[in-house]
A protein has these predicted regions:
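Carbohydrate-interacting regions of secretory-pathway proteins
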Residues: 23-245
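Bacterial N-terminal signal peptides that target proteins for export
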Residues: 1-12, 21
Length: 245
């Protein structure tokens, strides 16, 4: 009797385990079906993936404006690039964005003039408010939270990953926007930045305090991408963005 009970018990256990395994497999399979990630085709050599908004591919400045007027910076079609036109002011996107992944390439002038903040200065402002500094920081001293890759006036880069003047460089930026709350407070955001593929900002907090000389102030759900005219002929190319919210 004891032996029989043991057999039954083992059989029951085996059946229960089998049912449990089937249920788990079915649940896992359903989860995969429900949550299948969208297919995105990567770009070649840093070009835009299939789900990105192309902001600049070298052919035109249609996505950009200077204030309320047409874009005034110089289009260099032969190089698929654009260049800061001194004195015309910032260039900004017509579209506005919240949380994003941004890819942008830039080059400071190969002919070196000036020093410190006067050498190859421009900047990439998320929402026109929070500047990731563009500067020739190759053998060029300045204050640390103002060098290339700094969250300007807030946080120095973790390392100096600068290429020499005139060379093309990349920023890949994950920006989580500070979010204005109903009670008037601001939920902090963050910057994660790769400079030439090297991590230089790692979830750096953004409390809502704008960078000095920002185009706009105050936290906002969405704002334009803004490129700075700091009087130096800095070039940009291959700019694309993916919306994350
Ligand atoms: Mg700047």
């Amino acid at each position: 009797m004891k032996k029989k009970f043991g057999k039954l018990s083992l059989t029951t256990l085996a059946v229960l385990m089998s049912i449990s395994a089937h249920l788990q497999a079915a649940e896992s399979s359903d989860k995969k079906k429900d949550q299948a990630p969208p297919i995105v085709t990567p770009g070649e050599n840093g070009s835009a993936p299939s789900d990105a908004i192309v902001l600049f591919d070298g052919s035109n400045l249609d996505e950009w404006q200077s204030g309320d007027a047409a874009a005034k910076w110089t289009l260099l079609k032969a190089e698929s690039a654009m260049e800061v036109k001194k004195g015309t002011g910032v260039l900004q996107t017509k579209k506005t964005f919240g949380d994003v992944q941004l890819h942008i390439e830039w080059a400071t002038p190969s002919e070196v003039t000036g020093s410190g903040q006067g050498r190859g200065n421009s900047g990439v402002y998320l929402q026109g408010r929070y500047e990731i500094q563009v500067l020739d920081s190759f053998n060029n001293e300045t204050y640390y939270n103002g060098q290339a890759g700094a969250f300007y006036n807030n946080a120095a880069p973790l390392v100096n990953a600068s290429r020499p003047p005139g060379k093309w460089q990349t920023y890949d930026i994950i920006f989580v926007a500070p979010k204005p709350q109903e009670d008037g407070s601001v939920k902090p955001g963050s910057f994660t930045v790769l400079h030439n593929g090297i991590l230089i900002q790692h979830q750096t907090p953004i409390t809502g305090k704008a960078s000095t000389a920002a185009a706009y102030s105050g936290a906002t759900p969405k704002g334009p991408l803004v490129l700075q005219d700091h009087g130096n002929p800095v070039r940009y190319r291959n700019i694309w963005i993916r919306e994350l919210n």
